């Protein structure tokens, strides 16, 4: 890597995925050094699951992949931004973005798939 990344004590960084065309924020997840390397190698977003403690490719089971157009790093090197072309919905709940609710609980996003049909 040509930029130093400041991984936290768990050796992770927060990663925001943003639709490269619309600018919509799709999701927030975490990446390890291996996830960043795999994303660069394949051109598809990879993340690190803190709950499963494993590397995962976005869309690996759903087919709703994120093709990376560019990876950006914030000024402190402690967060990254994936600019992506999203295939299908970004959220495992079936919505186009994980940010589909207001703080008051109003739904502002669009449900684009039924998660029960994808995740059995």
Curated annotation (Swiss-Prot):
User: What does the record give as EC number?
Assistant: 3.5.4.19
GO CC terms of this entry? cytoplasm
Q: Which GO terms describe its molecular function?
A: magnesium ion binding; phosphoribosyl-AMP cyclohydrolase activity; zinc ion binding
> Cell division among the record's keywords?
no
Q: State the reactions this protein catalyses.
A: 1-(5-phospho-beta-D-ribosyl)-5'-AMP + H2O = 1-(5-phospho-beta-D-ribosyl)-5-[(5-phospho-beta-D-ribosylamino)methylideneamino]imidazole-4-carboxamide
Q: Which cofactors?
A: Mg(2+); Zn(2+)
Q: Where in the cell is it found?
A: Cytoplasm
Question: What is the first-listed, main subcellular location in coarse terms?
Answer: cytoplasm
UniProt keywords (A-Z) are:
Amino-acid biosynthesis, Cytoplasm, Histidine biosynthesis, Hydrolase, Magnesium, Metal-binding, Zinc
Q: How is this protein organized at the quaternary level?
A: Homodimer.
Q: Which family does it belong to?
A: Belongs to the PRA-CH family.
Protein name from the UniProt record? Phosphoribosyl-AMP cyclohydrolase
């Amino acid at each position: 890597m040509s930029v130093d990344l400041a991984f936290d004590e768990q050796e992770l960084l927060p990663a925001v995925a943003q639709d490269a065309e619309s600018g919509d924020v799709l999701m927030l997840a975490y990446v390890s050094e291996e996830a960043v390397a795999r994303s660069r190698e394949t051109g598809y977003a990879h993340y690190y699951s803190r709950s499963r403690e494993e590397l995962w490719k976005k869309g690996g089971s759903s087919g709703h992949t994120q093709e990376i157009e560019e990876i950006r790093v914030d000024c402190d090197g402690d967060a990254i931004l994936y600019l992506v072309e999203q295939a299908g919905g970004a959220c495992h709940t079936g919505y186009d973005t994980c940010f589909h609710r207001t703080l008051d609980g109003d739904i502002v996003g669009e449900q684009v798939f039924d998660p029960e049909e994808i995740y059995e």
